[in-house]
Amino acid sequence: MTGLERQLTEMLEAPVGALGYELVGLEFVRAGEHSTLRVFIDHENGIFVEDCAEASRQISAVMDVEDPITVAYNLEVSSPGLERPLFKAAHYQQFVGHEVSLVLKMPMNNRRKWKGDILEVNGEIVTVTVDGNNEEFALSNISKANLVPKF
């Protein structure tokens, strides 16, 4: 998570929570003139289009006042979806036993991409079973993590 993403998460957690939603996480993707702020929300009863619209209005109001992003961007608010992104240790703990796809910031054993089942979470270390071997990953070295949907 970048410094800006950390700042945005801290800024938006309370307003999104006040609406009754969990701020699962967010991503700010810079793509030249077309940057995007993706905000993922969840609720115990699921997320519907109306929920995304309500959260989007609230987030837009906060962003207009605080103005933390200096470039033009599009705001996308959605549920985490089938390929749910994992941002916090609690997310990994919630999905112990599920398959996850990881992309690392710094390679481990000459690999940046890993896929396996989440075995356990111990503080800031996630253990994933990859091809029968238990591999430990520091959350600080995980650039991107998503659940792998089962069909």
From Swiss-Prot:
It is found in: Cytoplasm. GO terms for cellular component: cytosol. GO terms for biological process: ribosomal small subunit assembly; translation. Required for maturation of 30S ribosomal subunits. Pfam families: DUF150_C, RimP_N. Keywords: Cytoplasm, Ribosome biogenesis. This is Ribosome maturation factor RimP. It comes from Aliivibrio fischeri (strain MJ11) (Vibrio fischeri). Belongs to the RimP family. PANTHER family: RIBOSOME MATURATION FACTOR RIMP. It comes from the Bacteria.
